[in-house]
Amino acid sequence: MTGNTAPSQADARRTVISVDAMGGDAGPAVVVAGIAKSASKNPDIGFLLHGPAEELEPLVARRKTLKGRVEIRDARDVVTMEDKPSQVMRNGKGTSMWSALESVRSGEADGVVSCGNTGALMALSMLRLRKLPGVNRPAIAILWPSRNPQGFNVMLDVGADVRADAEDLLQYALMGTSYIRNSMDLPCPRVGLLNVGTEEHKGRAELKEAYALISQNAEKANFEFVGFVEGSDIPGDIADVIVTDGFTGNVAIKTGEGTASLLRSAIREAFEYSILSRLAALLAYTSLSRLAKRIDPRRVNGGVFLGLNGTVVKSHGGADATGVSAAVKLAFLLAEQGFAEKLAARVASAVELAQDDATSADADAPGDSETGSTN
């Protein structure tokens, strides 16, 4: 254990975020720059930084804003993007990712941020933090720019598990509505189930079953179910929460990121074409800046792992300092709001409702004494 004064010692009021400094595409320097950016904006945040101490100490020492705000936890091993989750679960105890999660498990930190291997992070999170009672499959939720008044939709799952049956999709709806209530203060969010069309007869069998389950639970869980939605509705204003399986969601998010990158490049090329177009770009600078900010994926960098006993935020592996800072901000806000505890209560309530429904159904079913048979 090395570093400056521990965040908890420096100021007991600070919310402590545990950060895996390793595993990102750009290395620990970008992660340290990102937490320094967060520290300069937020005096109420402290950090536990996990990774090889000899690499991290000089990086932290160069950042004046981190003085007294960071404690370095020496972790010699690194989870790479090539490592299989099963291998990490067996042999990952000495890694920075394991160490970062352990700080949340022990109560030293209020949330964790990692840029590392998504599959390994989810596997270790389930191993060290455990799933909430009643949750079958955790999900990764992201904020997606949209035309809604709040400016974003929540979409899940975007890669935690490529499979999802009807019960899983119902749980995603419940967890997604809890997330958006806390992050955007929407008392009765609208939920859409992603499909190949909006008609009820379209889609796979599990989607049709999920449609019925979500419809049945909407009123009890205090959300509005708008039915099936299509890919074109993801950035629209029809729904606030988009529910899908991890395979479809991951393809959608990668497609969206690629399209945003193409749009930025096309606009830049168009305005650099001639002297007149450059003059037009100068005149439209304010509007173009707003557009660039609107579609900048770094602003919403960070997928939240829902369904765990703790707050885990997965930053994009290629995130720069701005992206890392955005992920830290998200972890801080969720920790400040006690989101993990609220989600646990919501899932427990949903499980109780399901059990009550099952009990009622059993009570209503005719027993042997009502069959009218005699021996």
Swiss-Prot record:
Q: Where is the composition biased (Low complexity)?
A: 356-368
Listed under GO biological process in this entry are: fatty acid biosynthetic process; phospholipid biosynthetic process
Subcellular location, in the record's words?
A: Cytoplasm
- Signal sequence annotation: none
| EC number(s) per entry | 2.3.1.274
Q: Which domain of life is it from?
A: Bacteria
Keyword Transmembrane helix attached: no
State the Gene Ontology terms under molecular function: phosphate:acyl-[acyl carrier protein] acyltransferase activity
> Annotated pathway, please?
Lipid metabolism; phospholipid metabolism
Q: Does the keyword Lipid biosynthesis belong to this entry?
A: yes
The reaction(s) annotated as catalysed by this protein in its Swiss-Prot or TrEMBL entry are: a fatty acyl-[ACP] + phosphate = an acyl phosphate + holo-[ACP]
What enzyme category does the UniProt record give? Answer: transferase
Which HAMAP family does this UniProt record tie to the protein? PlsX (MF_00019)
Question: What name does the UniProt record give this protein?
Answer: Phosphate acyltransferase
According to its UniProt entry, this protein's organism is Ruegeria sp. (strain TM1040) (Silicibacter sp.)
The UniProt gene name for this protein comes to: plsX
